[in-house]
Amino acid sequence: MLVTAFILWASLLTGAWPATPIQDQLPATPRVRLSFKELKATGTAHFFNFLLNTTDYRILLKDEDHDRMYVGSKDYVLSLDLHDINREPLIIHWAASPQRIEECILSGKDGNGECGNFVRLIQPWNRTHLYVCGTGAYNPMCTYVNRGRRAQALPWTQMQVVRGRGSRATDGADRPTPTAPRQDYIFYLEPEKLESGKGKCPYDPKLDTASALINEELYAGVYIDFMGTDAAIFRTLGKQTAMRTDQYNSRWLNDPSFIHAELIPDSAERNDDKLYFFFRERSAEAPQNPAVYARIGRICLNDDGGHCCLVNKWSTFLKARLVCSVPGEDGIETHFDELQDVFVQQTQDVRNPVIYAVFTSSGSVFRGSAVCVYSMADIRMVFNGPFAHKEGPNYQWMPFSGKMPYPRPGTCPGGTFTPSMKSTKDYPDEVINFMRTHPLMYQAVYPLQRRPLVVRTGAPYRLTTVAVDQVDAADGRYEVLFLGTDRGTVQKVIVLPKDDQEVEELMLEEVEVFKEPAPVKTMTISSKRQQLYVASAVGVTHLSLHRCQAYGAACADCCLARDPYCAWDGQACSRYTASSKRRSRRQDVRHGNPIRQCRGFNSNANKNAVESVQYGVAGSAAFLECQPRSPQATVKWLFQRDPSDRRREIRAEDRFLRTEQGLLLRALQLGDRGLYSCTATENNFKHIVTRVQLHVLGRDAVHAALFPPLAVSVPPPPGTGPPTPPYQELAQLLAQPEVGLIHQYCQGYWRHVPPRPREAPGALRPPELQDQKKPRNRRHHPPDT
């Protein structure tokens, strides 16, 4: 019976979640690990490989209505096909002028890494145009770009567009060179609408911005000065008053790094709509020991600022701390404070999306990453709670306990609670003054179950980005997490509830998405097309959300993978699709039980085990290889000397060493001969991976066969055919039971020894032979005159 999405997700998030010491949180092992070359060989990934002299790709906008994805990079704006990013890409070359680049270099900036036009903002203006901004070599600029609707007539001036490998890009300039109108070139930039990007895009390309364009009004968290010291949340464009946060007020913003902006309505009343900003900043709570805190801030869209105080500044700005920590057994929490990325998972209720956030630890002693999940109910509860206030003899932070002005600070005008006030300019002065000095909430926002959903400690990488997809499987709906790392890989992870009210994390796969490892910068997902798009400094890759065939060719392998995208169809592991036939698709994500799901397909599991014969010499070592298909399986070695004997498990001893690749037998003895079986057990399903029949040969017999006396080896007379190998002549003289085994051993030995190449005439001799023959010195006398 199908389980609804809400019931399964609630069972995961509301079950008991016991605290685990942080030192015990080991990195999960992926079931499938693919290199970039192996990923390309599957045919499920494509890398944007057009020869552009650019770097720093950022996926800035996904337009599923037009099947396009818009990417910004250094000096370029790209429009890529969502189905195939290499199919006829549209490319605008938008570089800063040479004069501006020269001025940037003279100001002390790097000519390659800073003095370029790094595109940092692409927002949908309307159905036909985009609004784009770039750093402009430390001179931010913005303009409009035609989306590329073929039915629309083009203006007489336009950018030349690259539509293939052989196309050319226009020469860089602040104002592009006009070209002749072409109906084919429909993706173009409008140079006559070029304007300043101050308050919309940063000067420094290393500083990130978070933006949202709502009702033709641009909201952006950005640094607005050349030195990168004045950070603000701005509102520009549109008909409303231009707004910003209070300038140089560390209580509002203190050296922030903006991550994400999202419009989330509070109620059915549109006047209650709020824009949420996610960022990290240096905390002002403890100035003697400043730390980095993750924050969530919000503003009302209809905020007009104050009448006498906070003129043209936000009068509804509030912020709270986002906590992502692991509680310890002693009550001390290990915090992950550096917010890196945010993904907002929409639900059927647009007012209550689920917030996924990636955090990393501060400092260099302890390195770790975590993913925490937050609910809007908890976020709203904190913003409706007490304000942080400094009071007492030590001037410490306390919850504000005085008289609260009306309307409550942070309330939107004309909304559910203030229907009579049409503007924030109508608010009393005590409300505005309170907002200026009390922007911080006293309580913090904690994740669901007050602990992370995913934790990575002791790993050689850090998480950088997150994207989430909801997948309908045979036994319910699951949330699949795609996590980008700073070494250029993407992990596919699901977290399942267990019967004992704990949770279980499964890393289904880890793939390298770039030829050259580079940190994943941005990532977006298309559930409609079942594709994931990943960007870094070196390029853009799009890959399928599933590679079912990589799990194996058996029903048990497909079932044990527990991938919600995949199921056994009777022939292979393939994409799961809902069917009216109950047994047409074998899938068990919740339990992964192949014994129950793969009845009729498991009988051949042991029959298909690889069997081999291996030889060893007494006193030497032998390595028996065993590579189970799943790294999550438990491997055991069983030994059987004769068919009539019982199999016994090989324990780790002085002479037996178990490794990830197999079993090493040191100092072989004649009693070690027999049948070795490598078994893999996963989720109570056991099967034989490989069988090795080991023959142990005596040292004396092998030595005599390989190095016989000279009298035995007599060269045959000419014309009698190839000489008989000396070990065969010795074998005819010996009558020991293991002579046949020695013969097989030697045949295999000589078959694998590469033949010695014959010396060509004039070939160089070894130095020791060259030294034996000294060259003769010739004296050349001048001819007699």
UniProtKB/Swiss-Prot annotation:
Keyword Kinase: no
Assigned keywords, A-Z: Disulfide bond, Glycoprotein, Immunoglobulin domain, Secreted, Signal
Tissues expressed in: Expressed ubiquitously in adulthood. During embryogenesis, expressed in subregions of the central nervous system and various other tissues like skin, kidney, lung and intestine.
Subcellular location: Secreted
Cysteines engaged in disulfide bonds, as pairs: C104-C115, C133-C142, C300-C412, C324-C372, C548-C566, C678-C746
UniProt signal peptide: 1-18
Region (Disordered): 583-602, 753-785
SUPFAM superfamilies given in the database record: Immunoglobulin (SSF48726), Plexin repeat (SSF103575), Sema domain (SSF101912)
SMART domains, per the entry: IG, IGc2, PSI, Sema
Any single Gene Ontology cellular-component annotation: extracellular space
Annotated Basic residues bias: 775-785
Family from the record: Belongs to the semaphorin family.
Name of the protein: Semaphorin-3F
Origin species: Mus musculus
Encoding gene per record: Sema3f
